[in-house]
């Protein structure tokens, strides 16, 4: 599998989900750690207007993780904002990992996925591959544009479900309110998140089973501006080897 689950998590964690009334630029820097040791970093810039958006980011492995596998990449999503709807136009991911380069480009037409190009071209799939169908892609968005849908209240932040496609995997990302004992300290809103693979994966793979049935993911949001919009600033992501902690800070 071509790191599909990793790309999905990257998409919804490293995103500024604000929609101001006029064009503004927001920059956030994120750091990821495991057992207190740095494993990754990312810088994201979001340009948001009343009728358009563009999100660009650079990410890289860090610390001990970089000793084992050097990863560097960029990701971009752009499109239109039409009232309360997000209409994606293009998504591009370009990264190198372990000396190999992979790229993904998704083109949208009328807000629907029109073309997907992945290089190098994926190898022939086995009988255990759950193929992505045309029906699966209906109303699907890329990982970055998905969370740009505006909300009018904090209560709505944790009551959302997104159809996401990253070029290989189609998954549903489901937000629900976190319990009283699950709140991230200092956060205005904490959501539980489930990533439910729909297609574009190998059946029986332990990573997929863990993601669907056991992964514990919490994401903290904070208000951004005076319009009731929110942005993710912290996350706890359960993995098979431990909990990854992601924290973000504004960059001037």
Regions found by a protein language model. Name each.
Residues 1-9:
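Bacterial N-terminal signal peptides that target proteins for export
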Residues 17-20:
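N-terminal signal peptide c-region/cleavage motif recognized by signal peptidases
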Residues 22-110, 152-252:
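Acidic, serine/threonine-rich low-complexity disordered tracts
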